[in-house]
Curated annotation (Swiss-Prot):
GO molecular function ontology, one term from the record: DNA-directed RNA polymerase activity
Lineage summary: Bacteria, Pseudomonadati, Chlamydiota, Chlamydiia, Chlamydiales
Gene: rpoA
Region (Alpha N-terminal domain (alpha-NTD)): 1-259
Catalytic activity line of the entry: RNA(n) + a ribonucleoside 5'-triphosphate = RNA(n+1) + diphosphate
Protein name: DNA-directed RNA polymerase subunit alpha
Region (Alpha C-terminal domain (alpha-CTD)): 276-376
Known function: DNA-dependent RNA polymerase catalyzes the transcription of DNA into RNA using the four ribonucleoside triphosphates as substrates.
Length: 376
């Protein structure tokens, strides 16, 4: 039986402070249907882990409404033609599949996620035909006369009429995920001449992700995740990403409930919270000025690391490459730096310090501090 009374302490994970959203080239700056999201830095391997999970959730997890069946005056089956309408029933069905309906089924809304019947009357007389040159297009907007559904493509043509007529049309709209074939849609109250359709519920059209290298300080062993999301306009890419994240969180929470020890992650050191002068005073300290064991001091000396600044800018894997530098010395140094509110692999670029000039810069800052204190 596991002892769950104490939390486990884990090293910090590098995480992005926020996710950056960018318009896609050629979109005119709009992010209504296409957008790219950039998250960095991530620990090595987490770019693909998150990218693949988000891609799958975006493609199969999001819900939206779609027309799952229809009936119309004079239509008995899907293989017939209708007198006075250019399109046959098969083409009308294909057009109905392209209808993009939008409605948020809020928890306290009247119908919620319930299937709805949308009934409409289409009346076309000779004057309507004359005004349109003899052919009157019936659009998606003409069929959405009730039900509270919006259409992203209201001018989308469903069929074209060539003679005066009156039609009663009923659309059955349901909420769902992904793509469902007509064979899998079961209607308990199906009408005699009601034709069931394949339904494309997902509002997400395309998802791609890419993983690139990025750096934290001098360490380049981190991931940058670039996620490209394209929707059909029923939800924005930003909404789609937010919804898919909640879906994944819901599923991961199942495994989090296992009765095991909890992990507490160490906090990353933020230089922004510290006074710049205070940080510099720590960075210019010599290695021999802090209380390290003789072994650790000698290891650093052999590696030609003389100041704290030279030490903290060094990535952890690089330290372990030095001769005789082992895990025990590494642990001691990390604990000592933590006491000083410092850590390995720090980004010192705000001080103009990099791996290529750290020795010179530490000497310059030390001279500057001594001069300021009247010890030059």
């Amino acid at each position: 039986m596991s002892d769950c009374s104490q939390n486990l302490l884990y090293d910090k994970f590098e995480l992005p402070e926020s996710v950056k959203m960018m318009a896609v080239e050629g979109s005119g700056g709009s992010v209504d249907k296409q957008a790219s999201f950039i998250a960095e830095p991530l620990e090595r391997g987490m770019g693909h882990t998150l990218g693949n999970a988000l891609r799958r959730a975006l493609l199969i997890g999001l819900e939206a409404p779609a027309i799952i069946s229809f009936s119309m005056t004079g239509v008995l089956h899907e293989y017939m033609a209708i007198n006075g309408i250019i399109e046959d029933v098969t083409n009308i069905i294909l057009n109905l599949k392209g209808a993009l309906l939008k409605k948020y089924p809020f928890q306290d809304s009247e119908n919620g996620r319930c299937t709805q019947l949308l009934k409409s009357k289409v009346s076309i007389d000779a004057s309507d035909l004359a005004a349109c040159g003899g052919q009157k297009a019936v659009t998606l907007a003409d069929l959405l006369q009730e039900g509270g559904f919006e259409s992203v493509n209201p001018d989308y043509v469903i069929f074209t009429v060539t003679q005066p007529m009156q039609l009663d049309i009923t659309l059955r709209v349901a909420f769902g995920r992904g793509y469902t074939t007509s064979e899998r849609i079961v209607l308990e109250d199906k009408g005699v001449n009601e034709i069931v359709l394949d339904a494309a519920f997902s509002p997400v059209v395309l998802v791609n992700y890419f993983v690139e290298d990025t750096r934290v300080g001098q360490d380049t062993d981190f991931d940058r995740l670039i996620l490209h999301v394209e929707t059909d306009g029923r939800v924005s890419p930003k909404e789609a990403l937010a919804f898919s994240t909640q879906i994944l969180t819901k599923h991961f929470s199942i495994f989090e409930k296992m009765d095991e020890k909890k992990i507490v992650f160490e906090e990353a050191i933020s230089l922004e919270k510290e006074n710049k002068d205070d940080i510099l005073h720590k960075l210019v300290l010599g290695i021999n000025e802090i209380e390290l064991s003789v072994r650790s001091t000698n290891c650093l000396s052999n590696a030609n690391i003389e100041t704290i600044g030279e030490l903290v800018i060094m990535p952890e894997p690089r330290l372990l490459q030095f001769r005789n530098f082992g895990k025990k010395s590494l642990c001691e140094i990390k604990n000592k730096l933590k006491e000083m509110k410092l850590e390995l692999g720090m980004d010192l670029s705000q001080f103009g310090v990099g791996l290529d000039n750290v020795k010179e810069k530490m000497k310059w800052y030390a001279d500057k501090i001594r001069s300021k204190n009247g010890k030059g």
